[in-house]
Amino acid sequence: AWGSKEISDTHKEIDLTAAYSFGKFGIAVTDYWWDGEKIGNEHAEETNNNYFHFDNHTTAHYIEAGLNYKISENFPLSIAWNTMFWGADKKGNGDQNYSSYVELNYPFEVKGIALNATLGISPYDSDLYGVSSFAVCNLALGATKDIKISSSFSLPLFAKLIFDPAHEDTHMVLGFTLR
């Protein structure tokens, strides 16, 4: 489960994922919902943003299936393909769009800091990802470090610098994890 809420406006997001790994392979199904409140929502008339509304043609949910594969422990590159198959990811004519996202991740460590390099692409036209053809939409470098607070508690901090060449945009995400 993952969620977020912007302080300055009405946007909020709740994502629920069920995943299973077997050997080098993994599968996942994720329910994304990020429509937030109707107030100030430019899509409020097109979808029913009630979290518990699950009609495929009017829901604000996006349901995605994903497959991933990790090459090996010695070369830990992972490859994932995710496709929206149900919900709000629609073409102009109302048909399902099947927007897809492919991501390569390579974890490594430098001086006790866990790092992860990411390349993400949208392989074809997708209104959801805002691209009309193949596009690189995610170049990122993430870092994680456990900060020892006491002999029995460490606080995992993380930072991620994200570039989106397709939209000429960038983001910085900072946070901590509670276990």
Predicted feature locations:
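A C-terminal functional module that forms or caps the active site or interfaces directly
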Residues: 116, 122-144, 148
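Detector for outer-membrane/organellar transmembrane beta-barrel domains
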Residues: 45-126
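Residues that define the transmembrane beta-barrel architecture of outer-membrane proteins
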Residues: 10-14, 21, 59-63, 94-102, ...
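Transmembrane beta-strand segments that form the barrel wall of outer-membrane beta-barrel proteins
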Residues: 1-7, 27-35, 50, 76-87, ...
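Surface-exposed loop and membrane-interface regions of Gram-negative outer-membrane beta-barrel proteins
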Residues: 1-54, 133
